[in-house]
């Protein structure tokens, strides 16, 4: 089997908050008549530049044409050579490698007539406990709207949430107090996510303030600036709660292991460059005796299905994970969206080959956008994933 062509389709899909996220749907064609699909998820992140899709397609074709899709390690090395790792969270090269690698996995599994999770080594479970995100309070008046989100999602079966914190601690504290008062033990807040906004000392003070409202807290996420390994270590010594950090390069993961800076690796294929790299990162965590949580950039169903296959194949996921992306959008580009039930993400049925997801060409056309340009998006809209222009 040889790769014969590549398609890249940019789509822009609004979240329920009004913020439009742009993604790229990947199709890889072969001489066997099989097509693999993937997703370069959520290009709507800083830094404030966009990728030219025509140039990207030509560059990727120069790597992929004529290749055997099963040569995953060879292709991934060539992808990394051309789209290198950096020490930055939202490196767009990782998004690109992720979309291609996921499509290759879909293609290979389809050829073998098995599911992607079987191609990854089989399943240890069929579902993953996940949480719904509560986005960061900038103003106290946002507390009530976020409480409405909890009410709505609890009715839909989501009983675990993660809270983005650090911009307005008074509002964060008010929200937690009211959640505890209204919902009691019916709701858990699994993590406080600082998103690298504060230095570790300020994060430590915030943690002491917010953990008065421990509602099943499992971890503290990203409580220091990016790549501040010493800060993470210092904070880890001073809090009783496990510290979690995203993995965005193997060098960065190596440094966190060397410094013993964290307890839990937050691993997401989009940030580390695909299923192949995510699996490596999970194995490195296991060797280092660290737990893993499955992260997210709020993918659509194609990207989330890939994550579900990965999560159900790993043995060291012992905490509530994050992939609830499809629930945040007003639409999708597939005929069969991923399944959520009672707060769990279910992997597609293993009797369905590949990722188990089928594109809907009419929806792909409906949400198609000409490019990945930014329009008039502000920094705070990017950070807080809102269409609200108030700052």
UniProtKB/Swiss-Prot annotation:
- Which residues does the record give as Mg(2+) 1 binding sites? 42, 45, 297
What does the UniProt cofactor note say?
A: Binds 2 magnesium ions per subunit.
A Pfam family per the record: MR_MLE_C
Which residues hold Mg(2+) 2? 193, 221, 246
Name the cofactor(s) required for activity, per the record. Answer: Mg(2+)
Alphabetically ordered keywords of this record: Lyase, Magnesium, Metal-binding
Regarding protein family, the annotation reads:
Belongs to the mandelate racemase/muconate lactonizing enzyme family.
> What name does the UniProt record give this protein?
Galactarate dehydratase (D-threo-forming)
Q: Organism source for this protein?
A: Oceanobacillus iheyensis (strain DSM 14371 / CIP 107618 / JCM 11309 / KCTC 3954 / HTE831)
């Amino acid at each position: 089997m040889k790769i014969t062509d590549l398609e890249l389709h940019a789509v822009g899909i609004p979240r329920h908050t009004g913020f439009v996220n742009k993604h790229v749907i990947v199709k890889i064609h072969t001489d066997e008549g099989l097509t693999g699909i993937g997703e370069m998820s959520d290009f709507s992140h800083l830094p404030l530049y966009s990728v030219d899709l025509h140039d990207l397609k030509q560059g990727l074709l120069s790597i992929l044409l004529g290749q055997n899709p099963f040569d995953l390690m060879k292709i991934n090395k060539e992808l990394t050579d051309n789209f290198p790792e950096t020490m930055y969270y939202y490196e767009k090269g990782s998004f690109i490698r992720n979309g291609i690698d996921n499509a290759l996995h879909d293609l290979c599994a389809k050829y073998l007539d098995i599911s992607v999770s079987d191609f990854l080594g089989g399943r240890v479970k069929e579902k993953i406990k996940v949480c719904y995100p509560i986005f960061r309070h900038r103003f106290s008046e946002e507390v009530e709207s976020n409480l409405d989100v909890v009410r709505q999602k609890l009715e839909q079966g989501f009983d675990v949430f993660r809270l983005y914190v650090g911009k307005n601690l008074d509002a964060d504290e008010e929200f937690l107090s009211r959640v505890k008062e209204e919902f009691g033990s019916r709701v858990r807040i699994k993590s406080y996510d600082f998103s690298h906004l504060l230095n570790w000392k300020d994060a430590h003070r915030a943690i002491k303030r917010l953990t008065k409202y421990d509602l099943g807290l499992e971890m503290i996420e990203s409580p220091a600036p990016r790549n501040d390994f010493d800060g993470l270590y210092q904070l880890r010594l001073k809090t009783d709660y496990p510290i979690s950090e995203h993995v965005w390069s193997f060098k960065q993961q190596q440094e966190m292991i060397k410094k013993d800076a964290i307890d839990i690796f937050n691993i997401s294929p989009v940030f580390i460059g695909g299923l192949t790299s995510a699996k490596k990162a999970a194995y490195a965590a296991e060797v280092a005796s660290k737990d893993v949580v499955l992260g997210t950039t709020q993918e659509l169903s194609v990207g989330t299905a890939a994550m579900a296959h990965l999560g159900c194949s790993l043995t060291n996921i012992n905490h509530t994970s994050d992939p609830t992306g499809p629930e945040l959008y007003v639409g999708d580009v597939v005929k069969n969206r991923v399944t959520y039930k009672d707060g769990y993400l279910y992997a597609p049925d293993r009797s369905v080959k590949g990722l188990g997801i089928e594109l809907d060409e009419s929806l792909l056309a409906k949400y198609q956008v000409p490019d990945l340009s930014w329009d008039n998006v502000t920094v705070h809209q990017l950070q807080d994933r809102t269409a609200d222009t108030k700052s």
